[in-house]
Amino acid sequence: MSTLTAPVPLTEPELKLLQTLVYQECGMYFDERRTHFLRDRLQRRLKACQIDSFYSYYRLLTSREGKQELVALLENLTVNETSFFRIRPQLELFQKSVLEELLRRKQERRDWSLRIWSAGCSTGQEPYTLAILICDALAYYYLRNPLPFDMPTPKPLIPPPWKVEIIASDINYSALLTAQQGIYTESQMETVDYTCRLRYFDKVGDKYAVKPALKNLVQFDFHNLKTEYLPQRNDAIFCRNVMIYFDEAEQKRLIEKFHRCLNPDGYLFVGHAESLFGLTTRYHMIHQNNATVYQRLEAAQ
């Protein structure tokens, strides 16, 4: 090893080896349009490890001792672009249509549990947004449909006997740590209005911390979507702007996994620019007000 001052040369066969390893580990596919990004991230890790040859680094990645470095590489390949209340038309569809239907259906069955999975949660803004939307939706729902008993004092965010569980997962440990801390800067809070800040956040210096009552609704965990061990019995899954990093074969496998992870008639939200068209017939597409959600079907149509 030596102190690196110049990029390590990388041949096409070496790049192909790295592409294959990344694909096998997490399903991310780097086509010709994204090889520059892959090369750049590889050079960063070579410099960080002070390794001056690709094959030395590859041997490290594939060794038992290199598991931590493999995690570091995969973290560098993920893009943690997220914000509170991102893609508002989808969130309005979730709150005003999907949640309304779920609450009505579950109350009829005396099923008081609600389970949502945020797959690819990054630094936590999406699952905390979902928690806020659910709390607001439950409050509004019971203004119009009173509970058959008195509400406890002080009023909890989630009225009993409801139990809300939001599973938030990512492959990036650093992003998960930020999400678990639940502390955000003023610029990260730009899309959160004043009333919402007062109700769900505490001001800590020049930052904002998610209030414990809201934070307790979200459980953060490491999950690799390539594996079969994924959260089950979900009423809705949010996996937005994740499948764009997968090839068609991996997209189809992931969509099938989500089908198994959803409750009957559960809902799948994907990115605004993503679609299940041509990938599966096991979901019914619902489109309202420039937003789309896919509802699980019980059998191929």
Region locations from a protein language model:
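Extended basic-aromatic, gly/pro-enriched interface segments that bind polyanionic ligands
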Residues: 119, 140-238, 242-253, 275-277
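Residue-level signal for inorganic ion chemistry
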Residues: 94, 237, 262
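Conserved SAM-binding loop of SAM-dependent methyltransferases across substrates and taxa
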Residues: 123-144
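Conserved beta-strand signature within the Rossmann-like core of class I S-adenosyl-L-methionine
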Residues: 264-272
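A structural alpha-helix within SAM-dependent methyltransferase catalytic domains
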Residues: 95, 131-135, 259
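Conserved AdoMet
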Residues: 2-117
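Core SAM-dependent methyltransferase catalytic element
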Residues: 236, 277-301
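A short glycine-rich, Lys/Arg-flanked "PGG" loop and its adjoining helix->strand segment in the class I
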Residues: 252-264
